[in-house]
């Protein structure tokens, strides 16, 4: 059922269909309806269409649970969780009887909150044995207002073989009294976790299907069913002849998602009848139907109708329903309706998230460093465009990438960054022109002897010529296209008496190369902003050396426009007060801009096998990042750009350190939410 992620188009693509006419041996997952449970079923669903709140129970007794048709993720009904008096109030579900203790399960449900602010939903496993009661947070999700959101928790049942009872507790700890809604509660083993919805009508209700025409009758039927006792019978009015039925699905759909719809159709007229299936959209002003599948259904044969829907990342509609419609005014039957998520198990971002760069548009640019592969990945591209208004090529503009051998400039990939930024109105930071790493050895090799250059005047001239040619060729090519350059990178070593790193650049040219680099870059593009960039700028000794370097260069009239503070840090170091001291120091240099160029916060060395403690570390990471941003906002007159060194954790140069805003699956961490709304980040 899985397939690789496809390019998202500007409008959502309505994709392929295939139909199987005479079905002889269809294979469906084992299914249990809500009131006919099998203890080891692979898929269990409660959709509340029977108007019962089961299996949800009050937690505690003051909570009010009510089935309502005022809103739903799918079908017709959901459960309102009201009467809350405490942040821990919510619902509890005893899931013990559903579990085979040799399997791993996904427990999921859809939740909606209608307050005017962000809220956090929490899912806790409560494990009770003969001696003890233990609670473990199984899932947490930040909810935007008025958007149905899927919340999933994995339960490794084999870890709890000695448990007498396992409860699932759902609450909204960011609010003591606000109500919320729950719909489509499912328990399924991981083999079937891609299934979002399945209806076989054995729950003795119409499963949330609705007739488009109020004169059309839909009822349960025992005279026709594919494999069990019941199916859904549709009888259009002979007056209106409208046999179209609808199934509301808006809450199930995620922007950028891919969904498979499958159902069985049976009709017993005297000839084949064409059936169509698709989606009906309502934007609040008008409706539109889009057919996903058409098929002739032969008489007296169950026929599978299958269609796939791809949603664009900008998809929006007030209401969405799946529809089935015969071309003739005949009675017909439906059975085994299902919706599957083709992207399950694959990383898919939440395209409803608030935009970071929009949040900070009145403070500074929000940037990200990305490798070239991100520009070729449509999912990465959408994330970049939503959250960032500045990008830095991670390695693609470093000397070894642009001039791997003398005179052999290679601009094709760097040009793609320029084209990408121009197309999407994103600013481009160039990184970096001069560095002691990722610079080809030929820069420092005598072209005649093959020996390493020395500090002789002749060799100095060779290296200066190479430096000038490289800078002016690169900066000149991107004149007016790169708004800021990290001209010189990491030239300071606080352990040296004079503070200069003993790199090949320094050993051959002395500190002169720094000054020359800025002058030549300015000549090539007088409007580009030129930065000195370095790490550990929070170290008092190092920042003092950098401060003196920049102040001296500016005193000589060298065109240095800003300092880049990399900010590769950890939970333990530095203290946020040192970051503020660094900003304060450089803000004393008149006209100097400050860019935070490579932010990440490593937590790896603190991590353990204890999930609760690791969650605590993620909270600490978020709180530290929030404190840093409080400082940066305070100095917004000089801090003009803030860049994160990576799009998500597995793209980071510190891959195992979980240092960025999103996890490997694009899911926002507490660090992200600390910059959007700190109130949803746990306090502990």
Curated annotation (Swiss-Prot):
Domain of life of the organism encoding this protein: Bacteria
Metabolic or biological pathway, per its Swiss-Prot or TrEMBL entry: Glycan degradation; xylan degradation
PROSITE patterns for the chain: GH10_1, GH10_2
Catalytic activity, as annotated: Endohydrolysis of (1->4)-beta-D-xylosidic linkages in xylans
GO biological process, one term: xylan catabolic process
Residues in GH10 domain copies: 350-678
Coiled coil: none
Keywords (A to Z) from UniProt: Carbohydrate metabolism, Glycosidase, Hydrolase, Polysaccharide degradation, Repeat, Signal, Xylan degradation
Gene3D superfamilies from the UniProt entry: Galactose-binding domain-like, Glycosidases
Pfam family, any one: Glyco_hydro_10
List of catalytic residues: 490, 598
Listed EC numbers: 3.2.1.8
Secretion signal, residue range per the UniProt entry: 1-34
Domain CBM-cenC: 40-190, 193-342
Gene Ontology molecular functions: endo-1,4-beta-xylanase activity
Family the entry assigns: Belongs to the glycosyl hydrolase 10 (cellulase F) family.
PANTHER family: ENDO-1,4-BETA-XYLANASE A, GLYCOSYL HYDROLASE
Listed name of the protein: Endo-1,4-beta-xylanase A
Originating species: Caldicellulosiruptor sp. (strain Rt8B.4)
Source lineage: Bacteria, Bacillati, Bacillota, Bacillota incertae sedis, Caldicellulosiruptorales
Name of encoding gene: xynA
């Amino acid at each position: 059922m899985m397939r690789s992620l496809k390019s998202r188009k500007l409008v959502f693509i309505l994709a392929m269909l295939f139909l199987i006419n005479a079905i002889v041996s269809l294979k469906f997952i084992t299914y249990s309806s809500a009131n006919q449970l099998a203890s080891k079923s692979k898929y269990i669903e409660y959709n509340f269409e029977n108007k019962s709140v089961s299996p949800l129970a009050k937690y505690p007794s003051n909570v009010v649970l009510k089935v309502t048709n005022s809103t739903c993720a799918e079908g017709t009904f959901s459960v309102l969780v009201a009467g809350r008096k405490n942040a821990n109030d919510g619902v509890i579900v005893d899931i013990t009887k559903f579990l085979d203790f040799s399997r791993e399960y996904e427990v999921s449900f859809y939740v909606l909150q209608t307050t005017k602010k962000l809220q956090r939903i929490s899912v806790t496993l409560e494990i009770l044995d003969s001696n003890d009661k233990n609670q473990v947070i199984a899932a947490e999700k930040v909810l935007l207002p008025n958007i149905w959101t899927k919340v999933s928790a994995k339960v490794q049942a084999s870890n709890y073989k000695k448990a007498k009872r396992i409860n699932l507790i759902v609450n909204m700890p960011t609010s003591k009294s606000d109500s919320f809604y729950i719909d489509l509660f499912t328990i399924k083993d991981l083999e079937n976790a891609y299934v979002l919805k399945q209806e076989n009508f054995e729950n003795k209700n119409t499963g949330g299907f609705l007739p488009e025409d109020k004169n059309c009758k839909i009822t349960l039927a025992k005279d026709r069913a594919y494999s069990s006792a019941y199916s859904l019978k549709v009888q259009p009015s002979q007056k209106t002849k409208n046999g179209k039925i609808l199934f509301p699905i808006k809450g199930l759909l995620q922007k950028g998602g891919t969904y498979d719809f499958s159902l069985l159709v049976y009709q017993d007229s005297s000839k084949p009848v064409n059936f169509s299936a698709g989606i009906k959209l309502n934007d609040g002003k008008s409706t539109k139907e889009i057919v996903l599948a058409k098929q002739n259904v032969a008489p007296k044969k169950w026929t599978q109708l299958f269609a796939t829907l791809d949603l664009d990342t900008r998809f929006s509609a007030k209401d969405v329903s799946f529809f089935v419609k015969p071309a003739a005014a005949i009675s017909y039957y439906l059975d085994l309706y299902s919706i599957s998520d083709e992207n399950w198990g694959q990383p898919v971002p939440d395209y409803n998230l608030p935009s970071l760069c929009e949040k900070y548009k009145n403070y500074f640019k929000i940037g990200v460093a990305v490798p070239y592969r991100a520009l070729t990945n449509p999912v990465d591209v959408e994330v970049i465009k939503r959250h960032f208004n500045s990008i830095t090529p991670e390695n693609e503009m470093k000397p070894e990438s642009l001039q791997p051998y003398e005179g052999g400039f290679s601009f094709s990939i760097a040009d793609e960054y320029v084209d990408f930024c121009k197309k999407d109105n994103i600013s481009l930071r160039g990184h970096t022109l001069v560095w002691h790493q990722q610079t080809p050895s030929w820069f420092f090799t005598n072209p005649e002897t093959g020996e390493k250059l020395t500090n002789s005047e002749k060799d100095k001239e060779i290296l200066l010529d190479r430096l000038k040619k490289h800078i002016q060729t690169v900066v000149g090519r991107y004149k007016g296209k790169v708004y800021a350059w990290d001209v010189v990178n990491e030239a300071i070593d606080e352990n040296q008496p004079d503070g200069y790193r003993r790199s090949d650049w320094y050993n051959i040219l002395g500190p002169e190369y720094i000054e020359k680099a800025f002058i030549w870059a300015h000549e090539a593009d007088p409007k580009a902003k030129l930065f000195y960039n370095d790490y550990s700028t929070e170290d008092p000794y190092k920042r003092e050396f950098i401060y003196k370097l920049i102040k001296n260069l500016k005193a000589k009239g060298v065109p240095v426009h800003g300092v880049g503070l990399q900010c590769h840090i950890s939970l333990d170091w530095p203290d946020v007060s040192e970051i503020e001291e660094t900003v304060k120091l450089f803000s004393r240099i008149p006209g100097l801009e400050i860019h935070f160029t490579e932010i990440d916060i490593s937590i790896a060395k603190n991590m353990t096998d204890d999930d609760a403690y690791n969650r605590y570390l993620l909270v600490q990471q978020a709180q530290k990042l929030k404190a840093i941003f409080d400082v940066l906002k305070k100095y917004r007159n000089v801090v003009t750009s803030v860049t994160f060194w990576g799009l998500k954790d597995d793209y980071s140069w510190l891959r195992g350190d979980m240092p960025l805003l999103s996890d490997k699956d694009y899911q926002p961490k507490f660090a992200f939410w600390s910059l959007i709304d700190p109130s949803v980040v746990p306090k502990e």
